């Protein structure tokens, strides 16, 4: 109202300004015209010039009037255009205000319904619980990741220690092999030296034998030459034999000692070789044992993996069968529910119709009895008021007819009032149903909006029953629906296993 008053005042002000401008323009034009006439009067002296002046003045006046008419028309057109613009702006402002008011009103109604809706509050509580579950699952997953990383580090450490141990064992084997090779080379060199010594001794013995033969030959020659020296030669020969025997004894003793030493060295070499062989056999046995353990572990892991794969395949097959059974059961339950709903609606409609008919009969009977009682009461009241029994027959009949018409009029008024009351009750009930339908529609719209806003972020953590049916799932894309169906089938199969 205030905006309309302001707009009217603005239009009046614009109109006054336009009128003042027009009056100012006329005044200035008159002044110019008077000045022009004065100049013409001073300049024109002859009659011809006066006539010419009058003719020019008439032309000027006509031109001036024409310009004035055009200016007035332009002013009026401008004023009408401004008025139309103002009216259009006013209508637009009113329409914008109405739209804003309706929007605020709708938003307040929606907010009130959201705050008072038990269903939306329960949905928000379920979503909050889902967010908490997602947070807990994320924490558990993080702990599992840390645990897995720690196990991975421990396993890597164990593998590194095993590699270090194997490398140390290989290095020890290399060192033992090198020592064995050095001892073997030493033994070979020692045997070579012994062989050289034995060869040298044999050569010395052969030289001794050669010398002995030469001595024998000299002795024989000396014996032949000088019989006197025979005894001496014999003594020398005896001495030589003793020397040979002693040499043989010493040689035999040395040989025995050397053989004993060589046997001892051979025994030690053989013992070392046996020890090395036992170590190699033990190492190979340990390697074979590790290989057998590794092979057994690999076979066990392969068997376990195959078993788990078979279990997963069986579980997947059971999940698929369970999902198909659930789909069939869901379709069957849906059909049964639809049938039950239709039967229930039919029974409710039939029961409602019967109740309405019975109620209508009761109301009609009560209304009829009430009307009869009302008629009798009003007739009795009118009769008592007019004392009909004291009138003659004609007046009494006239009065009774008058009373009857009055009662019928009252009954008609009561019927009209009854009908009006029923119509008002029907309108109120319809209005209440409309408000309830509007409230349910807003609740459903807000519920779907909340689901679309949060469900994609909580996939895998949504509680059961948060979706009412396929209509809710159709709010999302195909990927979300497939993931949701798969997770629901997994949960159902896990429950079945448990």
From Swiss-Prot:
InterPro entries reported in the protein's UniProt record: MNS1, TPH_dom
Residue ranges the record marks as coiled coil: 45-211, 270-348, 385-450
Keywords, A to Z, come to: Cell projection, Cilium, Coiled coil, Cytoplasm, Cytoskeleton, Flagellum, Meiosis, Nucleus
Question: In its UniProt record, which GO terms are filed under biological process?
Answer: meiotic cell cycle
GO CC, one annotated term: nucleus
State the compartments where it is located: Nucleus; Cytoplasm, Cytoskeleton, Cilium axoneme; Cytoplasm, Cytoskeleton, Flagellum axoneme
Q: What is its main location?
A: nucleus
Q: Which family does it belong to?
A: Belongs to the MNS1 family.
Q: What does this protein do?
A: Microtubule inner protein (MIP) part of the dynein-decorated doublet microtubules (DMTs) in cilia axoneme, which is required for motile cilia beating. May play a role in the control of meiotic division and germ cell differentiation through regulation of pairing and recombination during meiosis. Required for sperm flagella assembly. May play a role in the assembly and function of the outer dynein arm-docking complex (ODA-DC). ODA-DC mediates outer dynein arms (ODA) binding onto the axonemal doublet microtubules.
Name assigned to this protein: Meiosis-specific nuclear structural protein 1
Gene that this polypeptide is encoded by? mns1
């Amino acid at each position: 109202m205030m905006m309309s008053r302001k707009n009217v005042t603005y239009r009046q002000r614009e109109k006054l300004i336009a009128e003042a401008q027009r009056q100012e323009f006329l005044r200035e034009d008159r002044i110019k015209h008077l000045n022009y006439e004065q100049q013409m009067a001073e300049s024109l002296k002859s009659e011809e010039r006066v006539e010419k002046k009058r003719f020019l003045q008439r032309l000027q006046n006509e031109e001036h009037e024409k310009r004035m008419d055009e200016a007035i028309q332009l002013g009026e057109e401008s004023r009408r255009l401004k008025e139309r613009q103002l009216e259009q702006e006013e209508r637009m402002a009113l329409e914008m205000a109405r739209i804003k008011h309706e929007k605020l009103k709708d938003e307040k109604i929606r907010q009130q319904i959201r705050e008072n809706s038990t269903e939306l509050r329960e949905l928000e509580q379920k979503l909050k619980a889902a967010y908490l579950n997602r947070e807990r699952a994320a924490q558990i997953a993080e702990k599992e990741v840390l645990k897995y990383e720690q196990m991975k580090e421990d396993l890597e450490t164990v593998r590194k220690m095993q590699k270090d141990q194997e490398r140390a064992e290989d290095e020890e084997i290399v060192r033992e092999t090198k020592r064995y090779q050095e001892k073997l080379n030493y033994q070979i060199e020692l045997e070579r030296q012994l062989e050289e010594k034995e060869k040298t001794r044999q050569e010395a013995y052969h030289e001794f034998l050669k010398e002995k033969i030469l001595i024998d030959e000299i002795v024989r020659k000396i014996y032949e030459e000088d019989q006197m020296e025979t005894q001496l030669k014999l003594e020398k020969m005896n001495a030589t034999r003793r020397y040979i025997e002693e040499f043989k004894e010493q040689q035999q003793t040395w040989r025995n000692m050397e053989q004993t030493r060589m046997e001892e060295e051979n025994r030690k070499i053989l013992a070392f070789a046996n020890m090395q062989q036992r170590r190699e056999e033990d190492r190979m046995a340990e390697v074979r044992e590790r290989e057998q353990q590794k092979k057994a572990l690999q076979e066990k892991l392969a068997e376990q993996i195959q078993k788990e794969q078979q279990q997963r395949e069986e579980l997947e097959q059971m999940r698929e069968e369970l999902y198909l059974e659930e789909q069939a059961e869901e379709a069957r339950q849906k059909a049964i529910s639809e049938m039950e709903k239709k039967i229930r609606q039919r029974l409710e409609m039939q029961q409602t119709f019967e109740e309405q008919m019975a109620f209508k009969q009761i109301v009609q009977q009560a209304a009829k009895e009430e009307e009869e009682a009302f008629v009798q009461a009003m007739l009795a009241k009118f009769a008592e008021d007019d004392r009909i029994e004291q009138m003659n027959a004609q007046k009494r009949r006239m009065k009774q007819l008058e009373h009857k018409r009055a009662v019928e009029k009252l009954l008609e008024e009561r019927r009209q009032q009854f009908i009006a009351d029923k119509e008002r009750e029907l309108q109120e009930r319809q209005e209440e149903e409309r408000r309830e339908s509007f409230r349910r529609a807003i609740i459903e719209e807000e519920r779907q909006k909340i689901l679309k806003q949060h469900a994609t972020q909580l996939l895998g953590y949504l509680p059961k029953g948060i979706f009412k049916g396929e209509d809710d799932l159709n709010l999302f894309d195909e990927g979300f629906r497939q993931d949701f169906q798969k997770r629901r089938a997994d949960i159902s199969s896990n429950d079945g296993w448990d």
